[in-house]
C-alpha cells in the first residue's frame, strides 16, 4: 500500500519550486533594499514561548498547535507563527543590547492543525519582517509599505489594505468591559466559540466570521472609540505616513487580529470577495511582546504574509508558467562513448555551464527528443567516428543547425555562449 503525505501538506515539485524561487528572490531583494537582515529560527520551540507570547486563550494555542513531549520530558511545539520565535532569538542572542532598531526578516514553514482548504495547509510558509526598538509610527508605515511593495513587485492587483488600532493595554481594559456589557445580553445569539471568547477575551468577538456573530455585533463598541490620546495620536500619524507614501487603505474598526500580542496598529491585506479566507497577510505593533517573554520593554512592529495564498493568487491573476531551468547543454552519446561524455560533462560544469548527459542507453533519436523536452539550448553529440577525428557534433537546438567542433575547444566555446 502506498504511503501518502500527511493531510494538509504538499509536495513541491520542480515546476512548483521554480515559482517559489521567483517569489523568494523578490523577498530577498526587497529586504536588502529596505535594510532587513535574514534570521532563521528552529522549527520547534518551548511550548511556553507561544503560551506567553501568542496568548494561551487564542485559537492558535488552544486548538491548532502541534505539541509534543520529548524524551527529556520537555514540552515542545512546532512553530505556528514566526514573530514569537524571532523575538525569543532577538533576546537570547543579545540583539536588544546593540544599537536599535534591529530589522529582521524570515521565510520558512509554520505548522497549525487547521482544516485544509485552498491556500491553507497544516504546514505552510510565511514571509515576515520585524522591527525591534522603534516606537515611531513611521516604522508601522514602513512595514506596511514593504508588504504592499512585495505584492506590487509580483504584479498582483486589486488587494485592499485594512487598518485599525487596538490601542494599548489601558485602552483595551475599558473596551473589554464595554464589550462584555454589550454582548452578555446577546450571548444566545453567538456561536459556541464566541460564547467562550465572551468570558475569556471579548475583543475577539469583533473578529468572528460567522454571520450570526457579525449580525449580533453590528452595534458593538469598537477599539477606535476608546483610544487614549497617545494611541489616538499614534494612529493618526500612521495614517498620515501612509497618505504621504501614496498607500490606499480602508479603516476597519472591527479588525483586531487573532493574536494577543498586538497593540495599537493592526492591519490586514485582503483579496476583495475572497470569502472567509480572503486575507493574504497582516501584522501590526506588539510593544509588549518582548517583555512578555522575559525581556525589557522594547517596542516592535512587523507582518507575516502567507506564501501559499500569495502563490495561489499569483497563478490566478498572472497565469504565468515558470518552468524549471533545464541544462544549457545536453550531451548525447552514440556508440561506446560514455567515458568521453563523462569527462566532457565534468569540464562543462567546472566552467560554470549548466549541463547534463544521457544515462539510460536510449537511441540517439530518443536522446534528441529528450533534450528538446528539457529545453537544452545546445546538444553535444559524442559519436565514435567523430571522436576518432578528435571532434564532436554541436547542435543548436533553436536554429536546428549543427557543426563539427574540436573536442578540445567545445567547452570554451559553450562557456562563452553561456555567459552571453
UniProtKB/Swiss-Prot annotation:
Its EC number is 6.1.1.21. SUPFAM superfamilies: Class II aaRS ABD-related (SSF52954), Class II aaRS and biotin synthetases (SSF55681). GO terms for biological process: histidyl-tRNA aminoacylation. GO terms for cellular component: cytoplasm. The keyword Transcription regulation does not apply. Keywords: Aminoacyl-tRNA synthetase, ATP-binding, Cytoplasm, Ligase, Nucleotide-binding, Protein biosynthesis. It is an enzyme of class 6 (ligase). It is found in: Cytoplasm. InterPro entries: aa-tRNA-synth_II, aa-tRNA-synth_II/BPL/LPL, Anticodon-bd, Anticodon-bd_dom_sf, His-tRNA-ligase, HisRS-like_core, HisRS/HisZ, HisRS_anticodon. NCBIfam families: hisS. Belongs to the class-II aminoacyl-tRNA synthetase family. PANTHER family: HISTIDINE--TRNA LIGASE, MITOCHONDRIAL-RELATED, HISTIDYL-TRNA SYNTHETASE. Homodimer. This is Histidine--tRNA ligase. It comes from Desulforudis audaxviator (strain MP104C). The lineage of its organism: Bacteria, Bacillati, Bacillota, Clostridia, Thermoanaerobacterales. The gene is hisS.
Amino acid at each position: 500500500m502506498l504511503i501518502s503525505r500527511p493531510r494538509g501538506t504538499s509536495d513541491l515539485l520542480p515546476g512548483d519550486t521554480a515559482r517559489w524561487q521567483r517569489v523568494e528572490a523578490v523577498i530577498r531583494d526587497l529586504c536588502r533594499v529596505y535594510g532587513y537582515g535574514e534570521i532563521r529560527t528552529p522549527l520547534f520551540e518551548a511550548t511556553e514561548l507561544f503560551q506567553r507570547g501568542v496568548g494561551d486563550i487564542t485559537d492558535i494555542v488552544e486548538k491548532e498547535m502541534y505539541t509534543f513531549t520529548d524524551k527529556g520530558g520537555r514540552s515542545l511545539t512546532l512553530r505556528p507563527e514566526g514573530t514569537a520565535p524571532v523575538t525569543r532569538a532577538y533576546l537570547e542572542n543579545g540583539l536588544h543590547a546593540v544599537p536599535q532598531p534591529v530589522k529582521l526578516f524570515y521565510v520558512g514553514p509554520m505548522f497549525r492543525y487547521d482544516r485544509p482548504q485552498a491556500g491553507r495547509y497544516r504546514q505552510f510558509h510565511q514571509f515576515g519582517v520585524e522591527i525591534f526598538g522603534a516606537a515611531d509610527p513611521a516604522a508601522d508605515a514602513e512595514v506596511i509599505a514593504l508588504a504592499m511593495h512585495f505584492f506590487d513587485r509580483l504584479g498582483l492587483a486589486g488587494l485592499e489594505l485594512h487598518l485599525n488600532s487596538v490601542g494599548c493595554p489601558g485602552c483595551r481594559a475599558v473596551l473589554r468591559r464595554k464589550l462584555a456589557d454589550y454582548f452578555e445580553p446577546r450571548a444566545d445569539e453567538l456561536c459556541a466559540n464566541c460564547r467562550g471568547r465572551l468570558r475569556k477575551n471579548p475583543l475577539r468577538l469583533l473578529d468572528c466570521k460567522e454571520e450570526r456573530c457579525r449580525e449580533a455585533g453590528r452595534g458593538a463598541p469598537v477599539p477606535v472609540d476608546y483610544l487614549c490620546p497617545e494611541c489616538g495620536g499614534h494612529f493618526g500619524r500612521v495614517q498620515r505616513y501612509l497618505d504621504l507614501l501614496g498607500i490606499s487603505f480602508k479603516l476597519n474598526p472591527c479588525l483586531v487580529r487573532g493574536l494577543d500580542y498586538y497593540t495599537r496598529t493592526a492591519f490586514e491585506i485582503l483579496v476583495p470577495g475572497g470569502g472567509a479566507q480572503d486575507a493574504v497577510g497582516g501584522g501590526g505593533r506588539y510593544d509588549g511582546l518582548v517583555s512578555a517573554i522575559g525581556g525589557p520593554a522594547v517596542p516592535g512592529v512587523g507582518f507575516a504574509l502567507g506564501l501559499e495564498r500569495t502563490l495561489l493568487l499569483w497563478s490566478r491573476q498572472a497565469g504565468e508558467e515558470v518552468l524549471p531551468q533545464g541544462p544549457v547543454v545536453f550531451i548525447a552519446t552514440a556508440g561506446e562513448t560514455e567515458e568521453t561524455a563523462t569527462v566532457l560533462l565534468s569540464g562543462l560544469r567546472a566552467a560554470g555551464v549548466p549541463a547534463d548527459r544521457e544515462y539510460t542507453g536510449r537511441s540517439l533519436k530518443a536522446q534528441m527528443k529528450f533534450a528538446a523536452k528539457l529545453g537544452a539550448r545546445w546538444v553535444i553529440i559524442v559519436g565514435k567516428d567523430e571522436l576518432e577525428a578528435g571532434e564532436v557534433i554541436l547542435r543548436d537546438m533553436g536554429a536546428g543547425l549543427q557543426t563539427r567542433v574540436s573536442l578540445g575547444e567545445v567547452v570554451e566555446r559553450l562557456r562563452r555562449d553561456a555567459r552571453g
